[in-house]
């Protein structure tokens, strides 16, 4: 079998309901391709008749029969499909959300005890295997955990599940083991491509879950690195402390926490950054967009900034990197009519250059501008238009920054206005066509994005190296 496709570059943030501005749970993750690769994406709705009853992986020899009662769910699969589905993020008709996966690290002690399974499951498969069949975030943990125990996995991953009440984060351990923690309601979680959970209580199944034999597994292979008087730290046992982590991973957690807890002074290379923190104020959708667009603004590590040196500007991997494929914020809101409680905010391409667009998820179709992405470059879809804007604006980022900021603010304001207007209509007893509302939002964003592309192209053309100030 050919070498498996792996996407090592995602960044995740999770926001508990008491830490969010509106009492919602928010799960967000960038899906980033490997260096030198770009993966076109699309957003679709998978209806029960389109869900496979027997699933076969492309990346491994894994196959499995699936239940005959799938729910409808949204999905953000690879647009071309040649490497498998890679559904990545979605919300089902029970308003349960799933984001999969955040590739994470492990260590040789774990892999020696429970090797990865070449015929197991991976990121390609997980949303398709789990999301259509779960009615709570906790059910998602238990279903995926059972599949991991039975079939194994060929890679180490972190997976988020959410509903109106809870967010759960599951991390795989070796080939067949797993551990999961409920995100505290008043906290947020930052998770780059590292094993993250740093506290676990085996006697508290309300907030902590794991594979049935995990404690025996830890004892048998001497994986617990904490002293007897300390709480068990899964990150020490199952994670990594590599030089690469301090360049590629820990700085991303640091910059997110620096924005959400500016009063806490930390080292970007520290292995002791907390998995979860209570923010200094409540977190908004705009905050989530900002941290997932981060390129270390206001530090010497910003590749676009005026501080620092040529070396420092390239030392850490930005969150808002060039090879982001898509970013989804899965926003499950309380005290709303069920048909509009779940919102999936979508962005394509490099995050410093794009916007987040809200969609109602209890629908049968997604607007073509977001659903029809081709292999060739066209400006009639959101993915390629965003890719063009980023490539054109990057060489002169500071020149284009005001236009990018205005576009972001205006389009997200329109999104909030749309959400509020629909809620008012429903509460007044009016009938609302949610697919039509999604289409109107898509049409508006298409117009604004085309206008931005026109402006960026014009300005970039005037900044070309071969420009000359004299003309006839």
Swiss-Prot record:
Q: Does the keyword Zinc apply?
A: no
Superkingdom of this protein's organism: Bacteria
Query: What's its top-level EC category?
Result: hydrolase
User: Which family is annotated?
Assistant: Belongs to the peptidase C69 family.
The question of whether Cell cycle is a record keyword is answered with no
Entry EC number(s) = 3.4.13.19
Question: What GO biological process terms are annotated to this protein in UniProt?
Answer: proteolysis
Q: Tell me a Gene Ontology molecular-function term this record carries.
A: cysteine-type exopeptidase activity
Q: Which Gene3D superfamilies did the record assign?
A: Penicillin V Acylase, Chain A
Catalytic activity as recorded in UniProt: an L-aminoacyl-L-amino acid + H2O = 2 an L-alpha-amino acid
Keywords in alphabetical order, please. Answer: Dipeptidase, Hydrolase, Protease
Pfam families (UniProt xref): Peptidase_C69 (PF03577)
Name the UniProt record assigns to this protein: Probable dipeptidase A
What is the native source organism of this protein?
Answer: Streptococcus pyogenes serotype M1
């Amino acid at each position: 079998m050919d070498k498996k496709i792996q996407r090592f570059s995602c960044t995740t943030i999770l926001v508990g309901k008491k830490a969010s501005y509106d009492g919602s749970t928010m799960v967000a993750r960038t899906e980033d391709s490997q260096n030198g690769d770009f993966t076109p994406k699309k957003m679709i709705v998978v209806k029960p008749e389109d869900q496979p009853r027997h699933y076969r992986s492309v990346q491994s020899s894994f196959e499995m029969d699936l239940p005959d009662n799938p729910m409808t769910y949204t999905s953000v699969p690879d647009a071309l499909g040649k490497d498998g589905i890679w559904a990545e993020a979605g919300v089902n008709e029970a308003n349960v959300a799933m984001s999969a996966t955040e590739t994470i690290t492990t260590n040789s002690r774990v892999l020696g005890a429970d090797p990865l399974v070449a015929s197991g499951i991976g990121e390609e498969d997980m949303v398709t295997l789990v999301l259509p069949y779960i009615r709570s975030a906790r059910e998602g943990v238990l279903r995926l955990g059972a599949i991991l125990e039975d079939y194994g996995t060929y890679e180490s991953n972190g997976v988020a599940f959410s509903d109106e009440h809870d967010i759960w984060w599951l991390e795989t351990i070796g080939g067949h083991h797993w551990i999961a923690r409920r995100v505290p309601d008043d906290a947020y979680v930052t998770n780059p491509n590292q094993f993250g959970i740093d506290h676990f209580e085996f006697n508290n199944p309300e907030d902590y879950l794991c594979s049935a034999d995990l404690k025996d597994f830890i004892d048998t292979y001497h994986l617990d690195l904490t002293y007897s008087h300390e709480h068990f730290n899964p990150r020490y046992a199952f994670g990594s402390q590599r030089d690469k982590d301090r360049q590629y991973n820990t700085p991303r957690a640091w910059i997110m926490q620096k924005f959400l807890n500016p009063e806490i002074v930390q080292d970007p290379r520290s292995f002791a950054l907390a998995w979860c923190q209570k923010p200094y104020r409540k977190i908004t959708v705009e905050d989530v967009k900002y941290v997932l667009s981060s390129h270390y603004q206001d530090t010497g590590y910003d590749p676009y900034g005026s501080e620092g040196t040529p070396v420092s500007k390239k030392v850490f991997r930005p969150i808002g990197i060039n090879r982001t494929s898509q970013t989804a914020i899965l926003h499950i809101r309380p005290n709303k009519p069920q048909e509009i409680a779940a919102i999936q905010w979508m962005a394509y391409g490099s995050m410093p250059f794009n916007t987040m667009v809200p969609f109602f998820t209890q629908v049968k179709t997604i607007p073509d501008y977001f659903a029809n992405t081709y292999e060739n470059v066209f400006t009639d879809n959101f993915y390629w238009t965003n890719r063009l804007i980023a490539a054109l604006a990057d060489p002169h980022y500071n020149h284009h920054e005001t236009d990018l900021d205005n576009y972001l603010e205006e389009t997200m304001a329109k999104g909030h206005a749309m959400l509020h207007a629909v809620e008012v209509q429903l509460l007044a007893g009016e009938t609302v066509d949610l697919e039509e509302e999604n289409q109107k939002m898509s049409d508006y964003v298409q117009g604004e994005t085309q206008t931005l592309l026109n402006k960026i192209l014009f300005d970039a053309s005037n900044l070309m190296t071969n420009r000359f100030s004299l003309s006839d």
